[in-house]
Regions:
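Membrane-interface helix-loop-helix junctions at transmembrane boundaries of multi-pass membrane enzymes
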Residues: 178-179, 216-228, 278-304, 346-352, ...
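Start-transfer (signal-anchor) and selected internal transmembrane alpha helices
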Residues: 1-16, 101, 354-358, 634-658
Length: 658
């Protein structure tokens, strides 16, 4: 295991000490920003005001990795980006070690485990299977897993993959070997995985499905039923950070992120996969294949069906199906190297010596190759020279305290460099509602808007409280250049800042406040069907600039309380351009002021007052915390029962290895 870890640590050597490097298109900027926020608000971070017009912190992202980064940074007095890269390097190095451990525990062969761990460390067979992946990275001998980590910022996914083989091992011990105490270990590991990354959690689900098909006939049914308590216990242990409403929103948001549809074709694909697994395991069982081989073949069928189905046929078996490449490579290498291990002792000594020498030479060449590639990806830069930093600082300077709509990679890195709140942010799983997704899609694409592109975009920007918008043109250094029509605001909005092909525009408005007095008829009552269906917005946006309505001043008191001061006439309401969430309440003059969501998902309060009025808004999720607290207590009880191993540590003989 130490050798496998050392090889990977050597590949990513520069990452252990990295600050900033030339991969500003990576989403890691958003992850580091979350850790920075935790460092700045260690006591109370239940509300996160930076993204999507403010959202509960539990909706931002699973907190496990970001909390670990923040804790490391504060303990060692490091910058958040330095701490993040240490954790990322550790995750990269430990993933193959976890695969080594699973292979060893399934076969009791250190040689097979070492070969699989090193192959996973120094090869990427997915590059041979999908031309799009080869074009993305530039060759078949390059470090795809490191490219995912650095180029795309997939650190939470790779951190989760450290846990996936370990959870499969605990499942094997629990159901195949009947060791009940491994239920508790599995629950703890699964709980950790759930608070780290959803993609890796879905990858684990693919592995568990594969394991079930591989062992279904060999394991007594009651053991499978007992194992069902593992995910129940795991979820209860972490439900405080992943409450039920958040859990239920994840599939829909993930599907919306790439257009996955759960239609008849999708269910036909799943049925085909189930049929393949059943046939493959029937054949392997008749051939008396080793349980480890059955598992890895089944795991490859599951993960390969998802990944290669996307690249070969355009299927979306799961949302974001292209992201499960590391899981597929784990499975494929475990399956490919298994026959070599079984035949190894029967090979002539000269052949074994030759294969060993060739393997050592190959590993040496690939180690140098991977190390050079990693150094190229992780070449240090002066972040102050990047457009992401410069535009973020320009937003902070030219639009102090105001909400902004930032383009592409500027939005990703914005809140590592500043505390500027954003209309959008990261990540797809965090989008509070469909209307916000419609809004930023329309602003970026202008699809079918024609000559009214600027007008539609301005309506959406004003409706969601943005006071400045940044645009990256075709010659910008910004990575994604997401605006289909980057010139649409030119001549319609005043320019606050310009550098090369990048500009920040001031969105015209009477007030920079996020609080506004409106009449009930001006509230957005119907959700727009698409980005050009702006009729529901017009009365509301016009009210924002109506000089006959009193202005409202918003001031934050602390992390989850703010006050609004205004003058009201009877029947008037206060619209606050902040995402509504259960837990928000308001008082006016010591009396409760009902708060609800409008059709855009923003807050509206009914003060039922007149004259000078001060409203105090408070986000208090105490009811949810009490409920999830009881859930955690139940989870601890179940964990204790599993740890004690009622009924004995061994409930039956281990399965024979064939």
């Amino acid at each position: 295991m130490a050798l496998v870890f050392a090889v990977n640590a050597a590949v990513c050597w520069r990452l252990w000490f990295a600050d900033f490097y030339g991969q500003m298109g990576s989403v890691e900027g958003s992850f580091i920003a979350i850790s920075r926020y935790l460092m700045l608000h260690p006591g109370d971070h239940r509300w996160f005001p930076m993204w999507f017009c403010g959202i509960p912190f539990v909706r931002v992202y699973q907190p496990g990795l970001h909390a670990a980064v923040a804790a490391l940074a504060m303990a060692l007095r490091l910058s958040p980006q330095r701490a993040f890269h240490i954790v990322a390097a550790l995750a990269y190095s430990a993933g193959p070690v976890a695969l080594f451990w699973l292979c060893y525990k399934l076969t009791k062969s250190r040689g097979y485990a070492l070969a699989t761990g090193l192959a996973y460390s120094l090869t990427s067979p997915s590059l041979l299977l999908a031309a799009d992946l080869r074009r993305d990275i530039g060759g078949v001998t390059l470090a795809r897993r490191y490219f995912l980590l650095i180029g795309y910022g997939d650190a939470p996914h790779l951190a989760g993959l450290v846990l996936v083989p370990l959870i499969v091992w605990t499942l094997h011990e629990a159901v195949a070997n009947g060791r009940r105490r491994f239920h508790a270990a599995g629950a703890l590991l699964l709980a950790a995985l759930m608070v780290v990354n959803w993609t890796a959690t879905v990858g684990l689900a693919l592995a568990v499905i594969a394991y079930f098909f591989a062992q279904a006939r060999a394991v007594p049914p009651w053991r499978w039923l007992a194992a069902a308590g593992i995910p129940v216990t795991a979820y209860l242990l972490v439900c405080r950070w992943i409450p039920p409403d958040v859990l239920l929103s994840i599939p829909g948001n993930a599907a919306n992120s790439d257009g996955t549809r759960y239609d008849a074709a999708h269910w036909a694909q799943l049925a085909a996969l189930a049929g393949m697994l059943a046939v493959a395991n029937f054949v392997m069982e008749r051939a008396r294949a080793h349980p480890a081989l059955r598992f890895f073949v089944s795991f490859f069928l599951c993960s390969g069906f998802v990944v290669l189905g996307r690249y070969w046929f355009g299927w979306s078996v799961t949302p974001q199906a292209h992201r499960f490449q590391p899981e597929m490579e784990m499975a494929l290498l475990g399956a490919l190297l298994f026959p070599l291990w079984r035949a190894w002792d029967r090979l002539p000594r000269s052949v074994r010596t030759g294969l060993t020498a060739a393997g050592i030479l190959f590993c040496g060449v690939q180690l140098v190759n991977y190390h050079r590639f990693a150094n190229l990806l992780t070449a240090p830069i002066h972040v102050e020279d990047t457009i992401e930093y410069r535009m973020a600082k320009a937003f902070e300077r030219e639009n102090p305290g105001g909400r902004v709509f930032a383009p592409g990679s500027v939005a990703i890195w914005m809140n590592l460099f500043t505390d500027t709140p954003q209309m959008v942010g990261c990540c797809d799983q965090s989008v509070p509602n469909l209307e916000q997704r419609i809004a930023f899609y329309t602003i970026y694409s202008g699809q079918n808007a024609g000559a009214r592109d600027e007008r539609y975009s301005e309506l959406w920007l004003k409706a969601y409280g943005a006071s400045a918008v940044g645009v990256s043109g075709p010659n910008s250094r910004e990575t994604y250049k997401p605006f289909a029509n980057p010139a649409k605001f030119e001549g319609h909005m005043p320019v606050l800042w310009r550098e090369g092909d990048d500009a920040i525009y001031r969105i015209p408005g009477r007030s920079g406040s996020l609080a506004h007095v409106i009449w009930p008829a001006q509230e957005v009552r119907r959700a727009p069907l698409h980005g050009l269906d702006v009729a529901p917005l017009i009365a509301y946006v016009e009210a924002l600039d109506d000089a006959s309505l009193p202005e409202a001043r918003l001031r934050w008191i602390d992390e989850r309380r703010f006050e609004v001061e205004t003058g009201l006439q009877p029947g008037q309401r206060v619209s606050v351009q902040m995402s509504y969430a259960p837990g928000w309440s308001a008082t006016a003059g010591g009396r409760s002021a009902p708060v609800h969501a409008d059709a855009l998902g923003l807050m509206v309060a009914e003060p039922r007052a007149s004259g000078p009025t001060r409203l105090e808004f408070t986000y208090d999720d105490a009811a949810e915390l009490r409920l999830t607290g009881w859930g955690q207590l139940l989870g601890l009880v179940l964990l204790l029962v599993q740890a004690i191993g009622i009924g004995g540590a061994h409930a039956g003989p281990a399965l024979p290895e064939r």
